């Protein structure tokens, strides 16, 4: 790929700490140097940084605290300001300004908030400012889980309209087996499409300070590739890794973007975490997959979770297959009432209606 590129670089806690209990500042300095070099060459760089909790623990002198959500939020609240200050100081050496964006998944679930976040991201990039993104762990609850910043980096890549997403980790890439305990494990260099076989070999490599594993990196790669973004998983310790990815030099594992990426308005649907799920019968499944039809209430067998009209939900088959992500036209209570009924009965059952379909085909993304 030639010309100016937009690259999102995700740095996990294991990369920022080198597997220790404190931030490895010497290594972070080197990564900033690489980013600054590419920035000076005309490329647009976005940083997705983990490490707030590790920075907070370090600043407080490594207290022995219970491993609870409240403790993680406490450490994140203390560490986040330290972390952004570090990024700001290091990039300022090269005359580069940074702009902090703290996000939660809720910013991606709502279309208006998604567009606002996208506009902020692109304004920063248009003014040669490096966005530094982290999850707002100090207020998030369910968000502090395995894979948050992996998946967040894919969403950041979508917001930035990125060309590539680089997931830096403590492994050289995706292997055929866990290289830590299998000497025959081989590095997978190229991936065209993520399937169940790949998912089954993606073992976890979670450090004590972070919340990410290889399986969540596959999830992030899937989201980004379907949005038309190439993804590379590589070792953060590899010299010149950021420049290599920009220059299309083979490094780590490269996931190629799909040939027909999702249209822009559907990006947020695919990236948003489902607020609930519905199970459809075989007739509805066939209509959705083979004829591209909308989902009628008649085909709904089961509704799980509590969600509002307009939220993203998961559609499953009777066999448990994850069929689609979609925006529902009715809330969960209404769907439970009209499930299995003909569309003509909606108004009679509910006393109102938002149309004859539960999910319109234009608001559905097939997995």
Curated annotation (Swiss-Prot):
Catalytic EC class: transferase
Pathway listed: Amino-acid biosynthesis; L-proline biosynthesis; L-glutamate 5-semialdehyde from L-glutamate: step 1/2
Residues that hold substrate according to the record: 50, 137, 149
Binding site for ATP: 10, 169-170, 211-217
UniProt superkingdom: Bacteria
Gene3D superfamilies the UniProt entry points to: Acetylglutamate kinase-like, PUA domain
SUPFAM superfamilies in the record: Carbamate kinase-like, PUA domain-like
Alphabetized GO MF terms: ATP binding; glutamate 5-kinase activity; RNA binding
Cross-referenced PROSITE patterns: GLUTAMATE_5_KINASE (PS00902), PUA (PS50890)
Gene Ontology BP term (one): L-proline biosynthetic process
Record-linked InterPro entries: AceGlu_kinase-like_sf, Asp/Glu/Uridylate_kinase, G5K_ProB, Glu/AcGlu_kinase, Glu_5kinase, Glu_5kinase/COase_Synthase, Glutamate_5-kinase_CS, PUA
Subcellular location: Cytoplasm
EC numbers: 2.7.2.11
Chain ranges of the PUA domain: 275-353
Pfam families: AA_kinase, PUA
Entry function: Catalyzes the transfer of a phosphate group to glutamate to form L-glutamate 5-phosphate.
Family named by the database record: Belongs to the glutamate 5-kinase family.
Protein name listed in UniProt: Glutamate 5-kinase
Name of the gene: proB
């Amino acid at each position: 790929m030639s010309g100016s590129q937009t690259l999102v670089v995700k740095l996990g806690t294991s990369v920022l700490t080198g597997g220790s209990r404190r931030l490895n500042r010497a290594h972070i300095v080197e990564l900033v140097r690489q980013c600054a070099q590419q920035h000076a060459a005309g490329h647009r760089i976005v940083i997705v940084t983990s490490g707030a909790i590790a920075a907070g623990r370090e600043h407080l002198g490594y207290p022995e605290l219970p491993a609870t959500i409240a403790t993680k939020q406490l450490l994140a609240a203390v560490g986040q300001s330290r972390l952004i200050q570090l990024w700001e100081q290091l990039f300022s050496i090269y005359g580069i300004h940074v702009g902090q964006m703290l996000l939660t998944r809720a910013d991606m679930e709502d279309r208006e908030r998604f567009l606002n976040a996208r506009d902020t991201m692109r304004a920063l990039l248009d003014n040669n400012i490096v966005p530094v993104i982290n999850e707002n762990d100090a207020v998030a609850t369910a968000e502090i889980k395995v894979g948050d910043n992996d998946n967040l980096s894919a969403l950041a890549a979508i917001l930035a309209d990125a060309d590539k997403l680089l997931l830096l980790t403590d492994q050289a890439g995706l292997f055929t087996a866990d290289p830590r305990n299998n000497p025959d494990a081989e590095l997978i260099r190229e991936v065209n499409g993520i399937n169940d076989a790949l998912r089954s070999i993606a073992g976890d490599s979670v450090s004590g300070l972070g919340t990410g594993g290889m399986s969540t990196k596959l999830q992030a790669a899937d989201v980004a590739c379907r949005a038309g973004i190439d993804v590379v998983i590589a070792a953060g310790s590899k010299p010149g890794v950021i420049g290599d990815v920009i220059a299309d030099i083979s490094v780590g594992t490269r996931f190629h973007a799909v040939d027909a990426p999702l249209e822009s308005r559907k990006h947020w649907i695919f990236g948003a975490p489902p607020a609930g799920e519905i199970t459809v019968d075989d007739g509805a499944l066939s209509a959705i997959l083979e004829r591209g039809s909308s989902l009628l209430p008649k085909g709904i067998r089961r509704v799980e979770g509590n969600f509002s009209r307009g939220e993203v939900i998961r559609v499953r088959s009777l066999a448990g297959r994850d069929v689609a992500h979609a925006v529902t036209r009715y809330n969960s209570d209404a769907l439970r009432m009209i499930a299995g009924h003909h569309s003509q009965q909606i108004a009679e059952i509910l006393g109102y209606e938002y149309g004859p379909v539960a999910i319109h085909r234009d608001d559905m993304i097939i997995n």
